[in-house]
Each structure stands twice: as C-alpha cells, then as structure tokens.
Amino acid sequence: MDSHKSPKETVLITGGGGYFGFRLGCALNLLGVHVILFDISHPAQTIPEGIRFILGDIRCLSDIENAFQGVDVACVFHIASYGMSGREQLNRSLIEEINVGGTDNILQACRRRGVPRLVYTSTFNVIFGGQVIRNGDESLPYLPLHLHPDHYSRTKSIAEKKVLSANGTALERGGGVLSTCALRPAGIYGPGEQRHLPRIVSYIEKGLFRFVYGDPKSLVEFVHVDNLVQAHILASEALKANKGHIAAGQPYFISDGRPVNNFEFFRPLVEGLGYKFPSTRLPLTLIYCFAFLTEMTHFILGRLYNFQPFLTRTEVYKTGVTHYFSLEKARKELGYEAQPFDLQEAVEWFKAHGHGRRPGSCDSKCLVWDGLVILLVVTVVLVWLLPSVILSM
C-alpha cells in the first residue's frame, strides 16, 4: 500500500491485539494507512500514534458493525482465530464459535458496510492433516473435514471456503462487489512472538526438552512475522482494480521458502540460550500415541483441571511429518519475495527478558524429567501392547 497512492485509506484488522495483527497494523501505519485494531484483548505493546484500537468480539455482529461507524473501511484483514495449539486446541465449542461464527459475522459486516476487500489469514492445515506433502501447491484439494485430527484445522478449512466463496458477492452499500483472498501461512516466528516460542522456551527451561522425534530428514516450514506482513499487504493490493483483482477468490501458501527439519530449526534457540540440544530420538508413533492419551485425559479431566498438554496429535504431525509448499503462485501473482531471517532476533529477545541457562539451574530438574521420559515410554508401550497381550491369552 503506497502512502502516495492511498494516504487516507482505512483498514480494520481483526485480532489486531495479537502478535501478528499488531505487527501488521504498525507496518500499515508507517505506510500512511489509517489502521483500526479490533480485538477482544488490548495489545501487550504501546499503541503507536495514528492507530485506533477498538475492544470487541467477532462473535458479536454489533461489535463489528460498531467498529465501522463513521469510517469507510477499504479492507478488512481477518486474522482473529482460536484453538491453534495447546489446550486451546481441545475447546471445540469456542473454536467453532470464533473461527466459523466469527467469520460469518465478518463477511456479513463487510457486505452490509460496503467493504470492498477482505484478506483472510488461514493456515497450512486446511490441506495438511498428517500426510507427507513435498512442494505442494494451491491445486491440492482440501483435506476432507472428517480427516482433520483437530477442530481448529477443521474450522479454519470451513472458514476459508466461506471467505473464498464470498468473493464477488454484491455489497449492500456503495455498489460494487466484495473481493476476497486467503493466505495460508506456515508457523509464525519472530522476536516477541507470544504463542509458540514462549511455550518452547518454557519446556526448555523446565528440562522437558530431553528428546526429539521422527525422521531426522523430515522437513517443515516457518514464516517470519515480517514476511507474513509483507504477504498480507501485497494481497490487499492484489485485490484492487488497478491490479486486475488478480488475487480475488484465490488462496496462497506463505512461508520463508526454506524447508527445514523442525528440531534443527530450533537448535539455535536451544543452544543460544545456553542449553544442550538433546541427542535422544524417539519414534514418531510413540509420541503420537502419547499425544492421543494426553488428549483423552484432557477430555475426561479438562473441566476439573484444564492442564496444558505437552503435545497434541496435530502438533506431533506438524513437527514430525514432512510438509512444505511452493511459493510460486504468491511470487507470480502477489509479487511476494521472502526475505532471509533466522532465530537470532528471538534469542536476543529472550535473553533481554531474563531467559537463558544459569550454571547448575537445570541439573536436578533434568534428572527428574529423564525419569519421567522413561516412564512415558514404558506407559505408552504398555498401553499399546496390552490389547495384543489380552487377545493372545
């Protein structure tokens, strides 16, 4: 969005209080765009001058429409979602209310208020569900809904289809039609990222990161927050008439374009904070079985004790099964060019916030967790073998 071309353009960002939404808002603000951040929670950072924050819930249509009062919004970036990882992934009702119901409300508000462009932040998971994918592209079919191992991925798939199907629908105000597209990012990282990296660092500091798993040759992808910001701005531009609406109705995979083994990707973070990278490697099936048992335990006990699962089945797939995608369509149609980044910024951020190994800080914890890892392996093996033993008796 060139500030000389559209200095008075206004955009609204759902999920604008989160890590990526806030970063996108700041980037657009620097380009001279009027930015409205819409979220159920305030940003952790100070809101820069020129950016407006509105507290609201995408599950409430009136909240959304109130955010449009008195302004002509040219583009909505619909980022808000729920249930991406950890225990959130197991709250099916809330996931559906936000990811599907919230998206319905956003689409309805865009039509009523005459918003001409909508960029939806989707996920790799609308296509991936545990199957190996090498250099896949946008021609791949959606994963059938019943094959998704988690409700987040299932609802994101439903929502993406709704967004792309809404492309070309008539606007009730101002004439014209709604142009939509969907970006499917890999896992997001960057300095100050609030979801994945803090959880990983917490596991490292507690001595839980004692093993890796799966094929050491398996490859996955990540996307730096600033590359994802670039992609969203380009996608919004590509929905305009002067770009021939080239992105209208289209999905795009977005990543850094550098497939890498999941655990090797995080090695600089582990070692950069002064910890030893684990040498023990466990089978993927063993960890998947453990994740399944953990989910079942949470299903039974979650209402009494909403504990944080060590891993979910989807997280095991995402980290241990090869899946990466071509960026050719995003390059050709959006002009997307991934810039090179690594985890060094994140390492420095964590160090600046008091993280890092201190001499002797982990030794006793590590002995305890080594014992728990052995117990985990024995438990899963017993649960796995018990039915066979009973049948053979």
Curated annotation (Swiss-Prot):
Enzyme kind, highest EC tier: oxidoreductase
Gene3D superfamilies xref list: NAD(P)-binding Rossmann-like Domain
Key words, A-Z: Membrane, NAD, Oxidoreductase, Transmembrane, Transmembrane helix
Residues binding NAD(+): K156
Keyword Phosphoprotein: no
EC numbers for this chain: 1.1.1.-
GO biological process: steroid biosynthetic process
InterPro entries for the chain: 3Beta_OHSteriod_DH/Estase, Lipid_A_modif_metabolic_enz, NAD(P)-bd_dom_sf
Catalytic site positions: Y152 (proton acceptor)
Gene Ontology molecular functions: oxidoreductase activity, acting on the CH-OH group of donors, NAD or NADP as acceptor
GO annotation, cellular component aspect: membrane
Record-annotated membrane-spanning stretches: 282-302, 371-391
CDD domains in UniProt: 3b-HSD_like_1_SDR_e
Localization in the cell: Membrane
Topological category with respect to the lipid bilayer: Multi-pass membrane protein
Keyword Transferase: no
Domain of life: Eukaryota
Family to which this protein belongs: Belongs to the 3-beta-HSD family.
Name this polypeptide is given: Short-chain dehydrogenase/reductase family 42E member 1
Organism: Bos taurus (Bovine)
Lineage, opening ranks: Eukaryota, Metazoa, Chordata, Craniata, Vertebrata
